[in-house]
Amino acid sequence: MTPNGKPAIRLSLRAGERIFINGAVLRADRKVSLELLNDATFLLENHVLQPEDTTTPLRQLYFAAQMMLIEPAMREQAHSTFAQMLKGMFSTFKDAEILNALKLVDELVHNGRIFEALKTIRAQYPREAELMGLESPVLPVAATRKSAEANP
């Protein structure tokens, strides 16, 4: 339990794996477990989307949101980009499931819960792929394992 009464977040990293915490990039030199005892903004390396992977509207939105987490110096610019993209998506997407998720994402980001917004966006990748006639993306096993460990 953390000092503020919330449960601690436990993370397990493999040797060489990186994690972004409050804008800092940390690399584990060996297998390690971390316990976050207070509110911290973090993103696991396998959830970091690279620019070349922003091939769909939701992935582009995810990238803008992730930049708010991992580049604090660019937070305002990333938020502005995110807001513009989100506004465009509300007029582009007609699918109720995605529109409801986008409304939730907007609310989460507005309340500073960017990590949860990222999870919500990722959860819509298969639906977006289906609507676009693309092969549904599969989350790597390692990412699934880490997500479960990070969110008991």
UniProtKB/Swiss-Prot annotation:
One Pfam family named in its UniProt record: FlbT
InterPro entries xref list: Flagellum_FlbT (IPR009967)
Domain of life: Bacteria
Molecular function via GO: mRNA 5'-UTR binding
Alphabetical UniProt keywords: Bacterial flagellum biogenesis, Repressor, RNA-binding
Gene Ontology biological-process annotations: bacterial-type flagellum organization; mRNA catabolic process; negative regulation of bacterial-type flagellum assembly
Family as reported in the entry's similarity comment: Belongs to the FlbT family.
Function according to Swiss-Prot or TrEMBL: Has a post-transcriptional repressor function in flagellum biogenesis. Associates with the 5'-UTR of fljK mRNA and promotes its degradation.
HAMAP family linked: FlbT
Protein name: Probable flagellum biosynthesis repressor protein FlbT
Organism name: Brucella anthropi (strain ATCC 49188 / DSM 6882 / CCUG 24695 / JCM 21032 / LMG 3331 / NBRC 15819 / NCTC 12168 / Alc 37) (Ochrobactrum anthropi)
Protein's gene: flbT
